[in-house]
């Protein structure tokens, strides 16, 4: 099998303060057919400045994979249901092995 061919996919991450919030967001995205998959990992230790104060929080990261057609819809859905006042939203264009990339790109309804 030739694994040299690639397909473009989008990968985004956000973080939540609990595994329950991460599960809720992931399930909403999957059930809405907006993403092919979500992976939750954690706990992570996040350090940042928020409203002038240095903050140390335990968080869980959600990594989402989906097609470029759903880019705006995925971001809007996450920002709509996320419990944070200012959720992290980082989206990256990536290349995946062709068969996996095709699965990602064809899993979601448009």
Describe each region flagged by the PLM.
Residues 1-110:
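Positively charged, small/polar-rich N-terminal and surface patches that mediate targeting and assembly
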């Amino acid at each position: 099998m030739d694994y040299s061919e690639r397909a473009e996919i989008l990968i985004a991450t956000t973080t939540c303060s609990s595994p329950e919030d991460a599960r809720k967001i992931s399930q909403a995205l999957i059930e809405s057919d907006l993403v092919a998959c979500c992976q939750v990992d954690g706990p992570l230790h996040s350090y940042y400045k928020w409203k002038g104060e240095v903050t140390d929080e335990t968080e869980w990261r959600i990594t989402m994979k989906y097609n470029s057609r759903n880019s705006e819809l995925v971001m809007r859905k996450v920002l709509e249901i996320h419990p944070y006042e200012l959720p992290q939203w980082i989206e990256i264009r990536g290349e995946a092995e062709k068969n996996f990339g095709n699965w990602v790109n064809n899993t979601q309804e448009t």
